[in-house]
Regions:
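Flexible, glycine/proline-enriched loop segments at strand-loop-helix junctions
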Residues: 42-43, 69-79, 104-109
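A generic structural signal for well-ordered alpha-helical segments
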Residues: 5, 88-91, 122-123
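Hydrophobic beta-strand scaffold residues
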Residues: 12, 98-99
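Conserved phosphate/ATP/ADP-binding segment of small-molecule kinases
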Residues: 94, 106-175
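Structural motif
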Residues: 66-68, 99, 130, 161
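Conserved N-terminal subdomain of the carbohydrate kinase-like
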Residues: 1-71
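Surface-exposed amphipathic alpha-helices with a cationic face
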Residues: 85-92, 153
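A generic structural signal for short hydrophobic patches within well-formed alpha-helices
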Residues: 56, 74, 105, 136-137
Length: 176
């Protein structure tokens, strides 16, 4: 994985290896018709679920231009959730572009209410929000793309890209 990142011009200087906890994995179904693919995952108890505020506070964000966050780490553990918040807060404070893809994984959360609360709260820290249309229904309460985009604009997102499978994507810029 590290070599593939390097081969694609992605910096690996912030990668760490955990000698105790395993690497989580996710598999994703290949689909041709545009429906949401099945994506079984094995992440509970993984190294990522042990991510902590200490590691986030130790990061030098000085040369980072973009922080991309998904909704998976905050689902893994309370500790990883706190670390996710801290990363987004630090990035915003440092005026680093923050992108957020909710990546709903209900089976990883304690319950649906907690999932909605946390993911909608994390969207407050994002400059760009990238939900799927199904995620909009669950998180914003609508499949109307304009209304869903407005929901995220009200949280502060300058740009919302709503993914809609074979129908492409709906892009909305916040009007000043």
């Amino acid at each position: 994985i590290e070599q593939a990142l390097k081969d694609n011009g992605i910096g690996t200087n912030l990668l760490t290896y955990d000698p105790v906890y395993r690497t989580g994995i996710q598999l994703k179904e290949y689909v041709k018709d545009g429906h949401d693919p099945a994506a079984p995952y094995y992440r509970k108890g993984s190294a990522a679920s042990h991510l902590s505020i200490r590691e986030i506070d130790a990061l030098d964000l000085g040369e980072i231009g973009l922080v991309h966050v998904t909704g998976i780490p905050p689902a893994l553990s309370k500790e990883a959730r706190e670390a996710t918040y801290r990363l987004m807060e630090r990035a915003r404070k440092a005026q680093i572009l923050v992108t957020f893809d909710p990546n709903l994984r209900p089976a990883l959360w304690e319950n649906d209410e907690m999932m909605r609360k946390v993911l909608n709260d994390l969207a407050n820290y994002a400059d760009v929000v990238l939900p799927g249309i199904g995620e909009c229904e669950i998180l914003a309460g609508t499949t109307d793309k304009e209304k869903a985009a407005d929901f995220y604009h009200q949280k502060g997102a300058a740009l919302v890209v709503i993914k809609d499978g074979k129908n492409g994507a709906y892009v909305s810029e916040k009007k000043e």
